[in-house]
């Protein structure tokens, strides 16, 4: 059987990397020849989780077709979020928890998606269905992914399935998920030593919304006022990125993981800003607005933006 690469989206988070690792282990147990890789360097939170459970970060690839003919995707399906030459390889498997958009294939494939808080929750279910024992380290990295995506089960994306998976995986991994989870999340909130250009690209995704190219980035912090001291520099970096990459709108969501509130910074045309204000029923003031309780890009940001841009 020919080798396949497994990877998550660009600017990978803990779910993108952790689920790729877990899926590769599962598929290899089932007879496939796979390798988990990444479409970018691991962030500080992910590095903390990898180190905790004894993993080295997957190698980073820029293209896939120079290595393999087929790939498996986790935690994404939209082509603009995937490897740059996704159109040159065959996608044989997808495991995801996001909307399906601009995705089509020439051949049938395995596609597993569910509206849960994290792709690793689906992966946990797949291990159980296949009756494959989950090793301690794999359980730990899957647990880390769910904690990351659900903000320690506080995100509105959290489901009973996520909660059940966390309890089960924490037991296998041998950790107190609340204590470990808070340490892991805090490890990802150190922004002092990073440039604005790096921060707006660490956890960012592009979306095609009715012909508009919309970029949504998110950073997690424990001190929101301190982060907002860099507002002008953030806006400058966002504006430069928009001009360089052709974004019609760039939104940066700065989320306080301790109280689950966010502040949004927005750059773009007057038309796109008007659509943003319509989406959130909120008025921008000097390119900034408070978004209380908004922590999930997938559930609380992309759907209202989609509706506003398609209206």
From Swiss-Prot:
<dbReference type="InterPro" id="IPR001667">
    <property type="entry name" value="DDH_dom"/>
</dbReference>
<feature type="binding site">
    <location>
        <position position="75"/>
    </location>
    <ligand>
        <name>Mn(2+) 2</name>
    </ligand>
</feature>
<feature type="binding site">
    <location>
        <position position="15"/>
    </location>
    <ligand>
        <name>Mn(2+) 2</name>
    </ligand>
</feature>
<keyword id="KW-0378">Hydrolase</keyword>
<protein>
    <recommendedName>
        <fullName>Probable manganese-dependent inorganic pyrophosphatase</fullName>
        <ecNumber>3.6.1.1</ecNumber>
    </recommendedName>
</protein>
<keyword id="KW-0963">Cytoplasm</keyword>
<feature type="binding site">
    <location>
        <position position="97"/>
    </location>
    <ligand>
        <name>Mn(2+) 2</name>
    </ligand>
</feature>
<dbReference type="GO" id="GO:0030145">
    <property type="term" value="F:manganese ion binding"/>
</dbReference>
<dbReference type="InterPro" id="IPR004097">
    <property type="entry name" value="DHHA2"/>
</dbReference>
<dbReference type="Pfam" id="PF01368">
    <property type="entry name" value="DHH"/>
</dbReference>
<feature type="binding site">
    <location>
        <position position="9"/>
    </location>
    <ligand>
        <name>Mn(2+) 1</name>
    </ligand>
</feature>
<keyword id="KW-0464">Manganese</keyword>
<dbReference type="InterPro" id="IPR038222">
    <property type="entry name" value="DHHA2_dom_sf"/>
</dbReference>
<dbReference type="GO" id="GO:0004427">
    <property type="term" value="F:inorganic diphosphate phosphatase activity"/>
</dbReference>
<dbReference type="GO" id="GO:0005737">
    <property type="term" value="C:cytoplasm"/>
</dbReference>
<dbReference type="Pfam" id="PF02833">
    <property type="entry name" value="DHHA2"/>
</dbReference>
<feature type="binding site">
    <location>
        <position position="149"/>
    </location>
    <ligand>
        <name>Mn(2+) 2</name>
    </ligand>
</feature>
<feature type="binding site">
    <location>
        <position position="13"/>
    </location>
    <ligand>
        <name>Mn(2+) 1</name>
    </ligand>
</feature>
<keyword id="KW-0479">Metal-binding</keyword>
<dbReference type="InterPro" id="IPR022934">
    <property type="entry name" value="Mn-dep_inorganic_PyrPase"/>
</dbReference>
<dbReference type="InterPro" id="IPR038763">
    <property type="entry name" value="DHH_sf"/>
</dbReference>
<feature type="binding site">
    <location>
        <position position="75"/>
    </location>
    <ligand>
        <name>Mn(2+) 1</name>
    </ligand>
</feature>
<comment type="similarity">
    <text>Belongs to the PPase class C family.</text>
</comment>
């Amino acid at each position: 059987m020919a080798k396949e690469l497994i990877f998550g989206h660009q600017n990978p988070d803990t779910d993108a990397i952790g689920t790729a690792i877990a899926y590769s282990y599962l598929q290899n147990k089932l007879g496939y020849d796979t390798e988990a890789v990444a479409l970018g360097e691991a962030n500080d939170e992910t590095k903390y989780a990898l180190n905790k459970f004894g993993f080295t970060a997957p190698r980073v690839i820029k293209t896939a077709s120079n290595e393999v003919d087929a790939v498996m995707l986790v935690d994404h399906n939209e082509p603009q979020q995937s490897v740059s030459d996704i159109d040159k390889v065959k996608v044989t498997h997808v495991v995801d928890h996001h909307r399906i958009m601009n995705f089509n294939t020439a051949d049938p494939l395995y596609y597993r998606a569910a509206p849960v808080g994290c792709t690793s929750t689906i992966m946990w279910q797949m291990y159980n269905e296949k009756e494959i024992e989950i090793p301690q380290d794999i359980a730990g990295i899957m647990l880390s992914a769910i904690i990351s995506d659900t903000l320690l089960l506080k995100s509105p994306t959290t489901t009973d399935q996520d909660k059940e998976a966390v309890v089960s995986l924490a037991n296998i991994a041998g950790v107190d998920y609340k204590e470990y989870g808070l340490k892991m999340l805090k490890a990802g909130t150190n922004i002092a030593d990073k440039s604005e250009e790096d921060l707006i690209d660490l956890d960012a995704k592009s979306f095609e919304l009715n012909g508009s190219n919309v970029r949504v980035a998110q950073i997690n912090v424990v001190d929101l006022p301190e982060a907002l001291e860099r507002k002008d520099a953030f806006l400058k970096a966002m504006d430069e990125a928009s001009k360089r990459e052709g974004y019609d709108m760039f939104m940066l969501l700065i989320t306080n993981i301790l109280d689950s509130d966010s502040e949004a910074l927005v750059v773009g045309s007057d038309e796109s800003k008007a659509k943003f204000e319509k989406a959130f029923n909120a008025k921008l003031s000097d390119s900034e607005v408070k978004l209380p309780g908004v922590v999930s890009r997938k559930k609380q940001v992309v759907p209202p933006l989609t509706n506003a841009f398609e209206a």
